[in-house]
Amino acid sequence: MKPLLLTIALFSLAIAPPARAAESGVRLFMTGNSFHMKTVPALAEVIAAAGIEGHTLVGTMLLGGSRAITLWEKPDDANPAKAALKSGKVDVLTLCPWRQIPDPGVDEFVALALASNPNVRVTIQELWMAFDSPNAANPDVRKDVAEAEKAPTPWDEATGEKLNAIHADYFAALEKQITAINKRNGKPVLLCVPTGHAAIALREQIRLGKAPGIRRQAELFSDRLGHPGAVLVQLNAYCHFAVIYRQSPVGVLAPKTLGGIADADRAPLARLLQQLAWDAVKAHPLSGLGSSQ
Protein backbone atom coordinates (compact mmCIF):
# COMPACT_ATOMS: atom_id res chain seq x y z
CA MET A 1 0.00 0.00 0.00
CA LYS A 2 1.30 3.47 -0.84
CA PRO A 3 2.11 5.75 2.11
CA LEU A 4 -1.01 7.37 3.51
CA LEU A 5 0.78 10.34 5.05
CA LEU A 6 0.03 12.84 2.30
CA THR A 7 -3.62 11.86 2.22
CA ILE A 8 -3.94 12.27 5.96
CA ALA A 9 -1.53 15.12 6.67
CA LEU A 10 -3.20 17.34 4.07
CA PHE A 11 -6.23 17.00 6.31
CA SER A 12 -9.06 19.31 5.38
CA LEU A 13 -10.87 21.54 7.83
CA ALA A 14 -14.11 20.94 5.97
CA ILE A 15 -16.81 20.23 8.51
CA ALA A 16 -17.67 16.56 8.74
CA PRO A 17 -21.00 15.55 10.27
CA PRO A 18 -20.92 14.61 13.95
CA ALA A 19 -20.77 10.92 14.73
CA ARG A 20 -24.21 9.33 14.96
CA ALA A 21 -25.05 6.56 17.35
CA ALA A 22 -25.38 3.10 15.89
CA GLU A 23 -28.63 1.22 16.40
CA SER A 24 -26.99 -1.00 18.97
CA GLY A 25 -23.64 -1.55 20.58
CA VAL A 26 -21.29 -4.46 20.10
CA ARG A 27 -19.98 -7.05 22.53
CA LEU A 28 -16.28 -6.26 22.68
CA PHE A 29 -13.31 -8.20 24.03
CA MET A 30 -9.96 -6.38 24.10
CA THR A 31 -6.51 -7.97 24.12
CA GLY A 32 -3.08 -6.50 23.71
CA ASN A 33 0.11 -5.16 25.22
CA SER A 34 1.14 -1.91 26.90
CA PHE A 35 0.59 0.03 23.67
CA HIS A 36 -3.10 -0.93 23.91
CA MET A 37 -3.90 -1.07 27.63
CA LYS A 38 -4.84 2.57 28.20
CA THR A 39 -7.05 2.48 25.13
CA VAL A 40 -9.59 0.38 27.05
CA PRO A 41 -10.93 3.23 29.25
CA ALA A 42 -10.33 5.87 26.57
CA LEU A 43 -12.40 3.94 24.02
CA ALA A 44 -15.18 3.42 26.56
CA GLU A 45 -15.34 7.19 27.05
CA VAL A 46 -15.47 7.84 23.31
CA ILE A 47 -18.25 5.28 22.83
CA ALA A 48 -20.30 6.82 25.63
CA ALA A 49 -19.74 10.34 24.27
CA ALA A 50 -20.91 9.18 20.84
CA GLY A 51 -24.19 8.01 22.32
CA ILE A 52 -23.75 4.34 21.50
CA GLU A 53 -26.31 2.29 23.41
CA GLY A 54 -25.87 -1.33 24.36
CA HIS A 55 -22.10 -1.44 24.07
CA THR A 56 -20.65 -4.17 26.28
CA LEU A 57 -17.05 -4.76 27.27
CA VAL A 58 -17.10 -8.53 27.67
CA GLY A 59 -13.58 -8.59 29.10
CA THR A 60 -9.90 -7.90 28.59
CA MET A 61 -6.64 -9.83 28.41
CA LEU A 62 -3.71 -7.44 28.60
CA LEU A 63 -0.04 -8.26 29.03
CA GLY A 64 2.91 -5.93 28.58
CA GLY A 65 5.25 -6.79 25.71
CA SER A 66 2.96 -9.51 24.42
CA ARG A 67 2.40 -10.76 20.91
CA ALA A 68 -0.89 -12.39 19.99
CA ILE A 69 0.82 -15.78 20.15
CA THR A 70 1.93 -14.98 23.71
CA LEU A 71 -1.69 -14.65 24.79
CA TRP A 72 -2.84 -17.58 22.68
CA GLU A 73 -0.39 -19.93 24.36
CA LYS A 74 -1.60 -19.13 27.87
CA PRO A 75 -3.34 -22.16 29.43
CA ASP A 76 -7.07 -22.38 28.84
CA ASP A 77 -7.81 -22.00 32.55
CA ALA A 78 -5.91 -18.69 32.52
CA ASN A 79 -7.10 -17.47 29.14
CA PRO A 80 -10.21 -15.28 29.36
CA ALA A 81 -9.97 -14.39 25.67
CA LYS A 82 -10.35 -18.00 24.56
CA ALA A 83 -13.19 -18.56 27.02
CA ALA A 84 -15.08 -15.50 25.79
CA LEU A 85 -14.63 -16.42 22.13
CA LYS A 86 -15.77 -20.00 22.70
CA SER A 87 -18.99 -18.68 24.26
CA GLY A 88 -19.92 -17.07 20.94
CA LYS A 89 -20.80 -13.88 22.78
CA VAL A 90 -18.13 -11.66 21.25
CA ASP A 91 -18.91 -9.48 18.22
CA VAL A 92 -15.53 -7.74 18.01
CA LEU A 93 -12.12 -8.86 19.28
CA THR A 94 -9.22 -6.42 19.40
CA LEU A 95 -5.63 -7.58 18.96
CA CYS A 96 -2.47 -5.56 19.45
CA PRO A 97 0.55 -7.79 18.83
CA TRP A 98 4.09 -6.57 19.28
CA ARG A 99 5.89 -5.61 16.11
CA GLN A 100 7.24 -8.97 14.96
CA ILE A 101 4.91 -9.74 12.06
CA PRO A 102 3.59 -12.17 10.96
CA ASP A 103 2.28 -13.25 14.35
CA PRO A 104 0.83 -16.79 14.30
CA GLY A 105 -1.38 -15.95 17.25
CA VAL A 106 -3.44 -13.68 15.02
CA ASP A 107 -4.36 -16.62 12.78
CA GLU A 108 -5.28 -18.71 15.82
CA PHE A 109 -7.51 -16.08 17.41
CA VAL A 110 -9.30 -15.38 14.13
CA ALA A 111 -9.99 -19.08 13.59
CA LEU A 112 -11.35 -19.55 17.11
CA ALA A 113 -13.50 -16.43 16.91
CA LEU A 114 -15.05 -17.51 13.61
CA ALA A 115 -15.73 -21.03 14.88
CA SER A 116 -18.13 -19.70 17.50
CA ASN A 117 -19.46 -16.60 15.73
CA PRO A 118 -19.32 -16.51 11.91
CA ASN A 119 -20.15 -12.79 11.98
CA VAL A 120 -17.34 -11.82 14.32
CA ARG A 121 -14.89 -9.08 13.41
CA VAL A 122 -11.30 -9.02 14.63
CA THR A 123 -9.25 -5.83 14.65
CA ILE A 124 -5.48 -5.54 14.75
CA GLN A 125 -3.86 -2.35 15.96
CA GLU A 126 -1.18 -0.91 13.73
CA LEU A 127 1.70 0.31 15.88
CA TRP A 128 4.53 2.84 15.63
CA MET A 129 8.17 1.78 15.80
CA ALA A 130 9.89 1.84 19.18
CA PHE A 131 12.70 4.42 19.33
CA ASP A 132 11.70 5.53 15.80
CA SER A 133 13.77 2.60 14.58
CA PRO A 134 12.85 0.15 11.81
CA ASN A 135 14.91 -2.42 13.72
CA ALA A 136 12.21 -2.52 16.41
CA ALA A 137 10.31 -4.91 14.13
CA ASN A 138 13.16 -7.41 14.02
CA PRO A 139 12.95 -10.67 15.99
CA ASP A 140 16.21 -9.79 17.72
CA VAL A 141 14.59 -6.73 19.24
CA ARG A 142 16.26 -7.09 22.64
CA LYS A 143 19.67 -6.18 21.28
CA ASP A 144 18.20 -3.18 19.46
CA VAL A 145 16.39 -2.03 22.59
CA ALA A 146 19.52 -2.34 24.69
CA GLU A 147 21.45 -0.18 22.23
CA ALA A 148 18.67 2.37 21.82
CA GLU A 149 18.20 2.82 25.56
CA LYS A 150 21.69 4.25 25.84
CA ALA A 151 20.55 7.57 24.39
CA PRO A 152 17.34 9.62 24.24
CA THR A 153 15.10 8.97 21.27
CA PRO A 154 15.29 11.89 18.80
CA TRP A 155 11.52 12.07 18.30
CA ASP A 156 11.59 15.69 17.15
CA GLU A 157 14.03 15.08 14.31
CA ALA A 158 11.53 13.00 12.34
CA THR A 159 9.64 14.20 9.30
CA GLY A 160 6.62 12.49 7.84
CA GLU A 161 8.72 11.22 4.96
CA LYS A 162 11.30 9.74 7.32
CA LEU A 163 8.61 8.11 9.48
CA ASN A 164 6.94 6.51 6.48
CA ALA A 165 10.30 5.02 5.49
CA ILE A 166 10.93 3.73 9.01
CA HIS A 167 7.52 2.04 9.12
CA ALA A 168 7.36 0.78 5.52
CA ASP A 169 8.47 -2.81 6.10
CA TYR A 170 6.33 -3.21 9.21
CA PHE A 171 3.22 -1.80 7.52
CA ALA A 172 3.76 -4.06 4.50
CA ALA A 173 4.21 -7.17 6.66
CA LEU A 174 1.07 -6.41 8.65
CA GLU A 175 -1.00 -5.82 5.53
CA LYS A 176 0.32 -9.05 4.01
CA GLN A 177 -0.80 -11.09 7.01
CA ILE A 178 -4.22 -9.42 7.14
CA THR A 179 -4.76 -10.00 3.43
CA ALA A 180 -3.75 -13.66 3.68
CA ILE A 181 -6.09 -14.34 6.60
CA ASN A 182 -9.01 -12.63 4.90
CA LYS A 183 -8.37 -14.48 1.64
CA ARG A 184 -8.26 -17.80 3.47
CA ASN A 185 -11.59 -17.06 5.15
CA GLY A 186 -13.24 -15.62 2.06
CA LYS A 187 -14.21 -12.35 3.71
CA PRO A 188 -12.69 -9.36 5.54
CA VAL A 189 -12.90 -10.76 9.07
CA LEU A 190 -9.58 -9.17 10.13
CA LEU A 191 -9.49 -5.38 10.01
CA CYS A 192 -6.60 -2.97 10.42
CA VAL A 193 -6.88 -0.13 12.92
CA PRO A 194 -4.39 2.26 11.27
CA THR A 195 -3.14 4.07 14.36
CA GLY A 196 0.41 3.92 13.06
CA HIS A 197 -0.50 5.96 10.00
CA ALA A 198 -2.62 8.36 12.06
CA ALA A 199 0.28 8.86 14.49
CA ILE A 200 2.62 9.76 11.63
CA ALA A 201 0.08 12.28 10.36
CA LEU A 202 -0.26 13.78 13.85
CA ARG A 203 3.49 14.07 14.23
CA GLU A 204 3.68 15.91 10.93
CA GLN A 205 1.00 18.33 12.11
CA ILE A 206 3.02 18.93 15.28
CA ARG A 207 6.19 19.50 13.24
CA LEU A 208 4.34 22.09 11.18
CA GLY A 209 2.99 23.82 14.29
CA LYS A 210 -0.62 22.88 13.55
CA ALA A 211 -1.49 20.77 16.61
CA PRO A 212 -3.18 22.89 19.31
CA GLY A 213 -1.39 22.68 22.64
CA ILE A 214 1.52 20.50 21.46
CA ARG A 215 4.90 21.95 20.56
CA ARG A 216 7.08 18.85 20.24
CA GLN A 217 6.59 15.33 18.90
CA ALA A 218 8.27 14.00 22.03
CA GLU A 219 5.23 15.12 24.05
CA LEU A 220 3.26 12.23 22.54
CA PHE A 221 5.37 9.60 24.29
CA SER A 222 5.78 8.71 27.95
CA ASP A 223 9.27 7.20 27.55
CA ARG A 224 12.11 6.57 25.10
CA LEU A 225 10.58 3.29 23.97
CA GLY A 226 7.50 5.07 22.66
CA HIS A 227 4.74 4.13 25.07
CA PRO A 228 1.80 6.42 24.33
CA GLY A 229 0.98 9.46 26.38
CA ALA A 230 -2.59 10.70 26.80
CA VAL A 231 -2.87 12.35 23.36
CA LEU A 232 -1.66 9.29 21.46
CA VAL A 233 -3.95 7.06 23.55
CA GLN A 234 -6.87 9.29 22.58
CA LEU A 235 -5.92 9.11 18.90
CA ASN A 236 -5.82 5.33 19.16
CA ALA A 237 -9.24 5.31 20.80
CA TYR A 238 -10.72 7.35 17.94
CA CYS A 239 -9.16 5.00 15.39
CA HIS A 240 -10.64 1.98 17.15
CA PHE A 241 -14.03 3.64 17.43
CA ALA A 242 -14.09 4.37 13.70
CA VAL A 243 -13.22 0.79 12.74
CA ILE A 244 -15.43 -0.93 15.32
CA TYR A 245 -18.51 1.24 14.78
CA ARG A 246 -17.82 2.10 11.14
CA GLN A 247 -18.58 5.76 11.64
CA SER A 248 -16.75 9.03 12.03
CA PRO A 249 -15.61 10.14 15.48
CA VAL A 250 -15.58 13.75 14.27
CA GLY A 251 -17.87 15.82 16.46
CA VAL A 252 -17.80 13.52 19.47
CA LEU A 253 -17.53 15.56 22.67
CA ALA A 254 -13.90 16.06 23.69
CA PRO A 255 -12.66 14.27 26.82
CA LYS A 256 -12.78 16.26 30.05
CA THR A 257 -9.03 15.96 30.40
CA LEU A 258 -6.30 15.21 27.87
CA GLY A 259 -3.04 14.79 29.69
CA GLY A 260 -1.41 18.16 30.26
CA ILE A 261 -3.23 19.92 27.41
CA ALA A 262 -4.64 23.29 28.47
CA ASP A 263 -8.42 23.59 28.58
CA ALA A 264 -8.42 26.15 25.76
CA ASP A 265 -6.60 23.72 23.46
CA ARG A 266 -8.36 20.52 24.46
CA ALA A 267 -11.42 20.72 22.19
CA PRO A 268 -9.50 21.92 19.08
CA LEU A 269 -6.88 19.23 19.60
CA ALA A 270 -9.53 16.55 20.09
CA ARG A 271 -11.14 17.67 16.84
CA LEU A 272 -7.80 17.32 15.05
CA LEU A 273 -7.29 13.84 16.51
CA GLN A 274 -10.78 12.82 15.44
CA GLN A 275 -10.22 14.02 11.90
CA LEU A 276 -6.81 12.39 11.58
CA ALA A 277 -8.21 9.11 12.89
CA TRP A 278 -11.13 9.22 10.47
CA ASP A 279 -8.89 10.16 7.54
CA ALA A 280 -6.56 7.26 8.33
CA VAL A 281 -9.39 4.75 8.63
CA LYS A 282 -11.05 5.90 5.40
CA ALA A 283 -7.73 5.81 3.53
CA HIS A 284 -6.60 2.37 4.68
CA PRO A 285 -7.76 -0.39 2.32
CA LEU A 286 -7.95 -2.99 5.11
CA SER A 287 -9.89 -1.03 7.73
CA GLY A 288 -13.31 -2.17 6.61
CA LEU A 289 -14.04 1.34 5.34
CA GLY A 290 -11.16 1.79 2.92
CA SER A 291 -11.32 1.95 -0.85
CA SER A 292 -10.68 -1.76 -1.45
CA GLN A 293 -13.43 -3.01 0.85
Could you describe each region identified by the protein language model?
Residues L5-A14:
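Bacterial N-terminal signal peptides
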Residues V26-T31, F35-N119, S133-N135, A283:
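Conserved SGNH/GDSL esterase-like catalytic core that processes O-acyl groups on lipids
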Residues K82-V233, A242-I244, G251:
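Alpha-helical cap/lid subdomain in secreted, periplasmic
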